[in-house]
Amino acid sequence: MNILLISPTQSGIGGIAQHVQGLKNFLEKNENSIEIISSENTFTIPVKGLKNPSFMISSFLKTKFKKNFDIVHAHNIPSALAMKNSSGKKILTIHGIFSEQINQLHGKTSGNISKKYEKDALSWADVITVISKESYDYYTSLGYKVIQIPNAIDI
């Protein structure tokens, strides 16, 4: 299979980065072709409050030239616009409750804007997965069909 992973980050010790690297390694061992779009290979503005929006735009533009994927797997809401722009079945994995995280980090105005975008992003996915029971409860209470898949660890 030809699979595109879209993630705000793919390196470092953070949870999303570790998950994406583990998923990539597993999928490649099973003879899949994997391509990753992340902040490491797109343009981002490294300023608080601008990194995610700049990643959203640059990853969206990058997918204009990337087609013919069987699966497009976006990690977290900032990756959803690029996912929407790509060909293939669309999986959106949400690592936490995005709009609440933005509200806590950047304030109520940004949180409210994020909540509206989050609603759009969820509608673009063929499948929505979450990693926690809290996220599962939250998104199902909003009426979305969600699958909970806890992050795996390599031991």
Q: Over which residues does each language-model region extend?
A:
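A short, charged, and often flexible helix/loop element on the N-terminal side
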Residues: 37-64, 103-110
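Histidine-centered beta-alpha loop that forms part of the nucleotide-sugar donor binding/catalytic region
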Residues: 8, 75, 94-97, 150-151
